[in-house]
Design a protein with these regions (language model features):
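Central regulatory/effector-binding core of bacterial HTH transcription factors
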Residues: 1-41, 108
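A late-sequence structural motif
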Residues: 140-185
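Short secondary-structure boundary/capping segments
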Residues: 3, 45-48, 64, 71-73, ...
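Secondary-structure junction motif
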Residues: 64, 78-99, 162-170, 180-185
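Short beta-strand->loop
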Residues: 45-55, 106, 125, 129-130, ...
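Flexible hinge/capping segments at coil-to-helix
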Residues: 43-54, 58-80, 163-164
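Hydrophobic hinge/microswitch elements
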Residues: 17-30, 86-140
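Short secondary-structure boundary segments
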Residues: 37-39, 60, 128-131, 152, ...
């Protein structure tokens, strides 16, 4: 839709190495718009777009005993494979609410590899629903309790008048995401 509304506007999409990098790029003027997970105090105009649950990623043989949720406290003392890319910010926020201290191992591999490592019994992990979609054949993925969410959104520079093309992009994204079925808590 945006391409139809603004056919002469180039959109440059970038992957970043960690969760704080989009905010750094925005603050340094290297980008006009970011899509990211909300951080404690985003120093930008922030528009919430989607809320996603955090899930425990467990080996298939993990003894759940019929439970449909995984208590955050059960991560305590367990070998925990920490996903790469500063996702630890979201994990630590969830752990802090319950005072959990897992035996964290930082792993510098992609999410799919972390899931495979869990499937091989090398530890357990926690990821958001968008991180695990389609990669769950060898593991159990169940929501953590108490419910923990991560807010995805769009940011623009604070206090700056948006260009016509950025304003239109913002409108298109808000309209598109309004029909997604994110979580409301």
């Amino acid at each position: 839709r945006f391409r139809r509304l603004c056919p002469k506007v180039d959109v440059d999409l970038r992957m970043v190495d960690h969760a704080l990098e989009p905010f750094e790029l925005l603050q340094s003027g290297k980008t006009d718009v970011i899509f990211a997970s909300r951080q404690k105090e985003p120093k930008c105009e922030w528009i919430p777009l989607y809320h996603e649950l955090l899930y425990a990623i467990l080996p298939k043989q993990y003894p759940l005993n019929g439970r449909k949720e995984f208590p955050l406290r059960e991560f305590e003392g367990k070998d925990f494979l920490m996903p790469y890319g500063r996702f630890d910010i979201d994990v630590h926020a969830a752990f802090a609410k319950e005072g959990v201290r897992a035996k964290e191992q930082s792993v510098y591999v992609d999410d799919e590899t972390v899931i495979r490592m869990v499937g091989k019994g090398l530890g357990i992990s926690m990821m958001s629903e968008l991180m695990i979609r389609g990669n769950t054949d060898d593991v159990l993925c169940i929501p953590v309790t108490p419910k923990s969410i991560r807010e995805l959104g769009m940011g623009t520079e604070k206090g700056v008048e948006l260009s016509e093309s950025v304003r239109r992009l913002k409108e298109c994204v808000v309209e598109y995401t309004s029909c997604l079925h994110g979580r409301t808590f």
